């Protein structure tokens, strides 16, 4: 472990003020494990300032082992969301990086994840730390890391970071935030302008402004608040925002995730307002959801199909599509129609981002409403996805329901749903053991023609319908996913899936 004194920097260990007896020294502290998208925990239980500092120290050690001192001088972007104390946890992370002589570009709290990620590229940084629990319940917070491309760190990198995390608080380097600012180790900056310039390069906003649409935006009390208004005001289009204030309790929803029942209040408001379209962004604005002109929710698999169709048909782009195994088979159909490869990877952008870079993909995405695009950063961006969806509507002069019909005319109707079952660790292990010894031969009365064990257990049926059972890496959940060619078949598949894990 590195010493606590670095040349030219006075540092201190986290713990007791009594000299020589730092709190946590010699005491076992919980193991921190990174799931599909970083580390998350309950605030004041396992998600504490000491544990955030431990994570940051581990990340600093990881960076110092892989980069020269010259490259380290490019620095790390640090920001966070609107959750309870996020800006203070971000300060804690910045103090640790600075004490390790890694410069910090600090953008503070309330900054969307895609803005933080793009800042890595804009400021030529080597990485980012993002304090956010994304769509988790209000009791939680989280710690995301991003690489020098602004995308998720690959699984091998995450394992290395975990190994670098000190066993207790005694191994943490710290320097006072204001002292680090005075010494030039921490630079505070506004990340918005670089991102806005990038958005204007990616999509022409003027036709959307002039279209005269009525758009209801629900940022779900999160970081997406104000962004669509800021980008689209100045024309005939009207932007109406709800749930735009900061409120880390997330009233009127269980969590800031754009699925039922969290979207119900937004849908009810949009119907009364007569909206042409509804856009939801999750807590950190990297994921999104949409509802049509009738207030009907468009599930995220259909949205992925629509965004891919928009890029392939309206923009005439060509290139690979990267998808997680939990998202739609409509993408394979589009790949055949437009003669582009489709790559299926494990769940999480830690798998999607590296494959996007490797294949120069046009789009990459997952079933939870996260989509990334060529020419941007290999990171989910709910704001850019929302603007692309609006551009699809305006360019084709179509309502959302008409866009969906256009998609289904090409690939056939698809229906999707997901059930999340809260379980304890013992139940998870029991189900896993059963599946490793005996797999179902039939689902919904249909034979299983193929089983994919890449990430969980995916059972593919003869007509392309599928059931996926997987175990969350960040929450105590078993997730049951299904996609089918009819609603009735979908319900039967889901019911069978739920029985399999009971």
Annotate each predicted stretch with a short phrase.
Residues 2-5, 17-19, 23-95, 99-100, ...:
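An N-terminal, well-structured beta->alpha segment
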Residues 28-29, 141-273:
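Gly/Ser/Thr-enriched, mixed-charge loops and adjacent short helices
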Residues 37, 78, 116, 129, ...:
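Buried hydrophobic positions in well-ordered alpha/beta secondary-structure cores of metabolic enzymes
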Residues 65, 69, 75-140, 230-291:
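N-terminal small/polar loop signature for handling phosphorylated ligands or for N-terminal nucleophile
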Residues 78-82, 217-219, 292, 375, ...:
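Short glycine-centered, acidic/aromatic-flanked micro-motifs in structured strand/loop junctions
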Residues 104-114, 297-300, 322-324, 345-346:
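Active-site nucleophile and cofactor-binding loops and adjacent substrate-binding regions
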Residues 276-277, 313, 317-502:
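Phosphate-binding and adjacent anionic-ligand microenvironments
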């Amino acid at each position: 472990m590195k010493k606590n004194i670095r040349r030219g920097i006075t540092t201190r260990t986290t713990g007791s003020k009594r000299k020589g007896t730092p709190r946590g020294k010699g005491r076992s502290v919980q193991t921190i494990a990174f799931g599909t998208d970083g580390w998350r925990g309950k605030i004041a239980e396992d998600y504490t300032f000491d544990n955030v500092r431990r994570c940051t120290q581990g990340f600093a050690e990881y960076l110092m082992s892989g980069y020269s001192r010259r490259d380290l001088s490019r620095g790390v972007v640090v920001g966070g969301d609107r959750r309870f104390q996020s800006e203070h946890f971000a300060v804690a992370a910045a103090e640790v990086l600075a004490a390790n002589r890694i410069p910090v570009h600090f953008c503070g709290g309330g900054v969307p994840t895609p803005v933080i990620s793009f800042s890595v590229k804009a400021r030529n940084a080597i990485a980012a730390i993002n304090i956010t629990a994304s769509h988790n319940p209000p009791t939680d917070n989280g710690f995301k890391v991003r690489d020098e491309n602004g995308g998720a760190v690959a699984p091998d990198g995450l394992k290395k970071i975990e190994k670098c995390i000190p066993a207790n608080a005694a191994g943490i380097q710290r320097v006072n935030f204001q002292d680090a600012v005075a010494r030039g180790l921490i630079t505070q900056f506004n990340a918005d302008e670089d991102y806005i310039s990038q958005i204007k390069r990616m999509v022409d906003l003027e036709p959307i402004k002039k279209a005269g649409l009525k758009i209801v935006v629900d940022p779900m009390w999160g970081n997406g608040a104000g962004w669509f208004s800021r980008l689209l005001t100045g024309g005939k289009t009207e932007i109406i925002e709800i749930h735009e204030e900061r409120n880390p309790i997330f009233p009127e929803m269980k969590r800031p995730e754009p699925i039922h029942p969290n979207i119900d209040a937004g849908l009810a408001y949009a119907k009364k307002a007569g909206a042409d379209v509804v856009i939801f962004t999750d807590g950190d604005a990297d994921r999104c959801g949409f509802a049509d002109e009738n207030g009907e929710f468009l599930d995220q698999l259909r949205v992925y199909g629509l965004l891919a169709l928009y890029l392939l048909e309206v923009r005439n782009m060509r290139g690979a599509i990267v998808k997680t195994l939990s998202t739609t088979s409509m993408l394979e159909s589009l790949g055949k129609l437009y003669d582009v490869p489709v790559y299926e990877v494990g769940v999480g952008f830690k798998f999607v981002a590296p494959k996007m870079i490797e294949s120069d993909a046009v789009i990459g995405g997952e079933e939870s409403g996260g989509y990334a695009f060529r020419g941007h950063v290999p990171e989910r961006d709910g704001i850019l996805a929302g603007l692309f969806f609006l551009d699809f509507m305006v360019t084709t002069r179509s309502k959302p329901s008409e866009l969906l019909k256009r998609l289904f005319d090409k690939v056939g109707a698809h229906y999707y749903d997901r059930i999340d079952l809260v379980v304890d660790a013992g139940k998870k292990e029991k189900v896993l053991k059963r599946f490793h010894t005996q797999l179902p031969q039939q689902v919904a009365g249909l034979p299983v023609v193929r089983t994919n064990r890449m990430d969980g257990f995916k059972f593919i049926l003869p007509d392309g319908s599928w059931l996926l059972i997987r175990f969350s890496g960040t929450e105590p959940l078993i997730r049951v996913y299904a996609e089918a060619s009819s609603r009735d078949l979908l319900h039967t598949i889901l019911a069978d899936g739920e029985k399999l894990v009971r």
